[in-house]
A protein has these predicted regions:
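Alpha-helical bundle cores of large, well-folded domains in eukaryotic cytoskeletal
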Residues: 1-271
Length: 271
């Protein structure tokens, strides 16, 4: 599946198209005939989304977008070359463009496959917006304010506690927030505030929650966590779309299945 590979496969040292998630595929049968299928996935390698080893890449889809989207589409997203994004060059600049990988061609195939399983053009564009937003978000830089304090939330509305870290490149944060459909301001409901404050899990008897100011390193960690969680949700949504397309027709209730377990990580092919 080209688009499942785009979102779940990556270049490693041993394999330029390594699956970085496990899956269990059920091929459903009724009276000796295949009537459908279903897929479960697990153990998506989330760490690879924001960090890669030397000469390795993140998930293909990010590099494919940078190569395969039209100039007009890139302009709408504000998309730059892959080498401009910190999230994509952790493995080194030489790992970004690989001779054995045609990202533009693979992107066209992934896009066509998404259409085949019923993900329409508007849904695809929303996916690209989210992914472009994550790329921008990971280019956000933080600086210390040299101060910081805690604040309380009452009835779900945070107070304006003093932040310990501030965004140094506001335009990048604003672009990321726009693509992700979020507010970028430093007010209590803005993305900058939410990334730079941590909520204390223990609420008081009055229903208030304590927010603690984070330092720049912790803010970067918060962005990494948000990025991994968001990408995981996108990946799970894609699996739902595939299963909806593969499910049996009405009246073709399966009587049995053949299960195929595919575990990622087998990259030594000597035997």
């Amino acid at each position: 599946n080209p688009f499942l590979e785009a979102f779940g496969n990556a270049k490693t040292l041993m394999n330029d198209n390594s699956s970085r998630f496990g899956k269990f595929l059920r091929i459903l049968y009724r009276e000796g005939h295949i009537v459908g299928a279903s897929m479960e996935t697990y153990l998506l390698e989330k760490g690879r989304i924001v960090g890669q080893g030397p000469m390795e890449r993140g998930y293909h889809i990010f590099y494919q977008m940078c190569q395969g989207l039209s100039s007009a589409e890139k302009s709408k997203l504000g998309l730059q070359p892959a080498t401009a994004y910190k999230m994509l060059i952790q493995g080194g600049a030489r790992a970004v463009n690989v001779d054995s990988i045609d990202d533009a061609k693979d992107f066209r195939e992934a896009r066509a496959a998404m259409t085949t399983v019923g993900i329409d053009a508007s849904q695809q564009w929303e996916l690209f917006q989210i992914l472009a937003g994550l790329l921008e978000l990971n280019n956000v830089e933080w600086k210390s304010t040299g101060r910081g304090s805690a604040g309380a939330t009452v009835k779900g509305v945070p107070s304006t506690a003093v932040m310990q870290a501030k965004v140094a490149n506001k335009a990048v944060l604003a672009k990321a927030a726009e693509l992700l459909g979020l507010r970028s301001d430093s007010g209590p409901l803005g993305l900058e505030y939410q990334l730079s404050m941590r909520m204390n899990d223990s609420a008081s008897k009055t229903g208030s929650v304590i927010y603690r100011a984070l330092d720049p390193v912790q803010c970067r960690d918060a962005i990494a966590a948000l990025t991994k969680h968001t990408y995981s949700i996108v990946f799970d949504w894609l699996i739902v779309q595939i299963n909806d397309r593969l499910k049996p027709e009405m009246g073709d209730d399966p009587q049995s299945y053949i299960g195929i377990l595919d575990i990622f990580g087998f990259e030594i092919f000597e035997h």
